[in-house]
């Protein structure tokens, strides 16, 4: 949750300039009535044509609209006060509030005299499009640009706000209301205490929101109680005892918006199931106090992708200022294919409240020039899986000249409740020399480190220059090619094979079925399959509380071992993949290889309904006798296409009576 947030608190968290041209015949399944509004019109006219247009907002507000109706404002026209139309549409026949003619978007100016310049209240199937909206006034009264709200209404279907320009929403300039999620540019709320109220198919797309004294785009609900999170902030417009059990909105899409110059949070989605936050540009948020560019809370299965977030302001070591935040009571968040840069507070934060977790998978993102804490992990941050990201953190002027620089971190754990955090397959350039202030809850596996400290816990660390094409020079999310590995890069085909990895990299290149490149960009395209792990069986059985599945689970840290007695040869390890793949080589990863590593082997592939030997007399030589992961690769004489591989183990080091394998991967 975000209010005036600190990490240590128990906390809950290009738009077309011209007017939309109207084509009613193509827009509706059922044709309604189209009403026209012109500043030079007359409220005594019928409003049914541009030449007989209505004049005022009051006339529009007095009309009860029906499914398929449209109210169109003349391009270039200006109106003062509040636009609050009445009536609801129907599925396939929404009520549309929009524009006609050519020129600038019609402007609705609340003038600071109304709570919201545009208000949609207890209505469904309504589309607001192509308007310019502003609401600026003096004093500390909270104000909103476009407000969608419902109370004790039940499901609210198919609300859309699209192609608007909302700007200069000025309420409180300091204090709680300047960080109030019920105030901002576009605000959607679900309230009440008797009838669970929530949105279905809520769409906020292709809007520009600028210069808001509180939030940019936010959805929130008083139907939010779960997992020990019982209320939002005391300054929210909910009476004492007014919060109710979690009832999430569904089908929420926040996409293609340009949000910038915002006092608090840029885009926030709360109390939602399966929300999508994608293709947004967010810049210069948290300008008045600690907050985050994009964050979500009380939300499950949220997908945050293809966003560019920058310029979030720094407010101190323990305050927010990150690009992205998985906040209070969130399960199974997915953050992928984003570009985070120049966020003074860092790239990502996870923090919750009550007993609920903040869960997230963070994959195939690029962070360039972020500061403070690149990854911040606080209360109840759990099941955080960070893999195949490229983190490029040079010594920027912001870091070099900041008086708090000594406290900056690459990874920072704030709370003992943090658990099950892993970093795998990442490229981390740490020219700023930021520290790793983590805990036993954080693991590292097969990351590439260039400059700065290296976590001692990464037993498979690769410490070298990643040899990328032109790193640190990206100018936008469409310009990430500088992070592509060169042909000589040690990152190529060096990664763990992680199941269900999404099938593509940060720029859409299909991933291989076997070992990927490290970092966010894949040099050579693969088959692009998003597959589960193979089924693994071992003829020797299991020892030391291990299971064969660990051999191909995408983690060096979870090895398989045979029993420590009775080992004879030959023995087999079989991998059955979800589908055929092309295999040109096999890599083995092992710890304490001189004591328990496989020495000689054959490789068989399942072809034409039988096992065929494709490599005879393969040999692995291990030199390490420690917990450091060693990796040895064998190339096949010729590539094979198969859905099953069998490793026939002919001999092994048996110092302790067993053999062990950390990971087997294909190339």
Give names to the regions the model predicted.
Residues 39-74, 78-79, 117, 489, ...:
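Acidic Gly/Asp/Thr-rich repetitive segments characteristic of extracellular carbohydrate-active
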Residues 54, 72-73, 88-141, 168-178, ...:
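Right-handed parallel beta-helix/beta-spiral solenoid domain characteristic of secreted/periplasmic
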Residues 553-615, 619, 628-667:
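Aromatic, loop-rich ligand-recognition surfaces of beta-strand-rich domains
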Residues 81-86, 92, 114, 337-340, ...:
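Predominantly extracellular beta-rich ligand-binding scaffolds that present long acidic/polar faces
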Residues 84, 111-119, 140-152, 174-199, ...:
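Extracellular beta-strand/beta-solenoid scaffold signature
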Residues 459-524:
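C-terminal accessory segments
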Residues 81, 135-137, 141, 164, ...:
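Surface-exposed loop/turn segments connecting beta-strands in extracellular beta-rich domains
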């Amino acid at each position: 949750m975000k209010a005036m947030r600190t990490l240590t608190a128990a906390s809950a968290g290009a738009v077309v300039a011209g007017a939309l041209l109207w084509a009613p015949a193509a827009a509706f399944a059922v044709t309604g009535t189209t009403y026209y509004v012109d500043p030079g019109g007359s409220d005594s006219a019928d409003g049914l044509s541009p030449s007989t247009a209505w004049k005022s907002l009051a006339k529009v507000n007095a009309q009860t609209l029906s499914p398929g109706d449209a109210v169109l404002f003349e391009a270039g026209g200006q109106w003062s006060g509040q636009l609050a139309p009445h009536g609801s549409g129907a599925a396939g026949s929404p009520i549309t509030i929009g524009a006609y003619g050519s020129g600038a978007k019609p402007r609705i100016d609340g003038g600071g005299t109304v709570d919201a310049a545009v208000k949609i209240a207890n209505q469904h199937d309504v589309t607001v499009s192509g308007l310019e909206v502003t609401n600026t006034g003096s004093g500390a009264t909270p104000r909103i640009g476009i407000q969608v709200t419902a109370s004790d209404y039940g499901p609210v279907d198919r609300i859309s706000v699209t192609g608007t320009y909302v700007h200069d929403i000025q309420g409180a300039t300091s204090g709680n209301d300047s960080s109030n999620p019920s105030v901002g540019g576009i605000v959607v709320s679900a309230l009440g205490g008797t009838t669970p109220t929530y949105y279905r198919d809520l769409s906020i797309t292709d809007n520009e929101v600028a210069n808001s004294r509180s939030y940019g785009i936010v959805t929130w609900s008083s139907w939010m109680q779960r997992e020990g999170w019982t209320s939002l902030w005391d300054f929210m417009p909910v009476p004492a005892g007014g919060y109710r059990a979690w009832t999430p909105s569904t089908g929420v899409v926040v996409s293609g918006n340009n949000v910038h110059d915002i006092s608090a949070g840029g885009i926030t989605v709360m109390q939602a199931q399966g929300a999508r936050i994608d293709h947004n540009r967010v810049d210069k948020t948290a300008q008045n106090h600690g907050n985050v560019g994009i964050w979500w809370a009380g939300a499950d299965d949220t997908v945050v992708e293809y966003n560019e977030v920058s310029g979030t302001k720094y407010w101190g070591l323990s305050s927010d200022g990150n690009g992205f935040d998985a906040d209070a009571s969130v399960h199974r968040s997915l953050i992928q294919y984003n570009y985070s840069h120049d966020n003074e507070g860092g790239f990502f934060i996870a923090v919750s409240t009550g007993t609920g977790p903040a869960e997230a998978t963070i994959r195939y993102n690029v962070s360039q020039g972020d500061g403070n804490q690149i990854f911040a992990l606080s209360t109840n941050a759990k099941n955080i899986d960070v893999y195949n990201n490229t983190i490029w953190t040079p010594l920027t002027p912001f870091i070099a000249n900041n008086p708090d620089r000594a406290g900056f971190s690459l990874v920072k754990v704030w709370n003992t409740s943090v658990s099950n955090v892993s970093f795998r397959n990442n490229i981390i350039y740490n020219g700023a020399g930021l520290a790793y202030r983590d805990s036993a809850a954080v693991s590292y596996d097969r990351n590439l480190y260039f400059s700065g400290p290296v976590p001692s816990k990464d037993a498979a660390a690769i410490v070298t220059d990643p040899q990328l094409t032109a790193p640190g020079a990206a100018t936008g999310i469409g310009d990430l090619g500088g992070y592509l590995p060169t042909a000589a890069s040690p990152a190529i085909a060096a990664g763990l094979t992680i199941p269900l990895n999404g099938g593509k990299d940060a720029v859409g290149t299909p991933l291989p079925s076997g070992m990927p490149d490290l970092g966010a960009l894949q040099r050579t395209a693969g088959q692009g399959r998003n597959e589960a792990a193979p089924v693994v069986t071992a003829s020797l059985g299991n020892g030391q509380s291990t299971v064969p599945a660990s051999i191909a689970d995408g983690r060096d840290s979870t090895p398989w071992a045979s029993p420590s007695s009775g080992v004879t040869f030959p023995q087999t390890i079989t991998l059955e993949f979800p589908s055929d793949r092309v295999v040109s080589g096999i890599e083995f990863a092992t710890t304490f290889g001189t004591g328990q590593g496989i020495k000689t082997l054959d490789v068989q592939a399942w072809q034409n309904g039988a096992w065929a030997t494709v490599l005879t007399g393969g040999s692995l030589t291990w030199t390490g006798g420690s917990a450091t992961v060693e990796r040895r690769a064998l190339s096949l004489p010729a590539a094979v296409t198969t859905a099953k591989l069998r490793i026939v183990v002919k001999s092994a080091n048996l110092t302790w009576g067993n053999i062990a394998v950390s990971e087997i991967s294909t190339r």
